[in-house]
């Protein structure tokens, strides 16, 4: 085979495998940081998190809940039906703040998309990430690498989508900037 005297054939094949989220295993929570960046404890981030939470609840009438999800990869989500944000309770202050700014952006930007405003998931994620980055910059915080990577991935996905024009991307950035300004101008 290696001397090419025997005919060889290469095949690609797939088989079913089992994959687990670390939260579905018996790995103790205190060991999670060995495998995942759960953020870090910070009094400044905790205060900003509380400030953002208060903004959501008072200005947007959007409740913010911390829950235990059965997944480390699910960090949070905005539910337009109940106008609420659910965040994973397993993360530390820095990650909770980053996720809350992202989900707050969804609450502002995507609460009431009408049927004529069809946006791809990548476009909505890009808008929420851009708003989150602007808010974290406004607070003087370093942007987490995971947020930067997510923003870049969503941008690449949008650029690859032939139905999304450069004008649409510009509109998304304008939309994100208006959402950022609505928070920055009204946060206590």
Question: Model features per residue range: what roles?
Answer:
Residues 1-188:
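N-terminal accessory/interface modules of nucleic-acid-binding and processing proteins
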């Amino acid at each position: 085979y290696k001397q090419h005297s025997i005919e060889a054939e290469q095949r690609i094949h797939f088989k079913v495998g089992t994959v687990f989220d670390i939260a579905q295993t018996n790995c103790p929570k205190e060991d999670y940081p060995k495998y995942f960046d759960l953020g870090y404890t910070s009094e400044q981030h905790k205060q900003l998190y509380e400030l953002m939470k208060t903004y959501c609840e008072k200005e947007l009438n959007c409740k913010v809940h911390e829950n235990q999800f059965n997944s480390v990869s699910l960090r949070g989500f905005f539910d337009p039906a109940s106008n609420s944000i659910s965040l994973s309770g397993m993360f530390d202050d820095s990650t909770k703040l980053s996720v809350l700014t992202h989900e707050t952006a969804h609450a502002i930007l995507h609460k009431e998309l009408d049927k004529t405003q069809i946006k791809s998931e990548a476009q909505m994620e890009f808008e929420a990430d851009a708003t989150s980055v602007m808010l974290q910059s406004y607070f003087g915080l370093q942007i987490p690498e995971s947020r930067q990577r997510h923003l870049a991935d969503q941008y690449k996905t949008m650029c690859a989508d032939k139905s999304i024009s450069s004008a649409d991307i510009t509109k998304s950035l304008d939309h994100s900037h208006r959402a950022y300004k609505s928070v920055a101008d009204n946060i206590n």
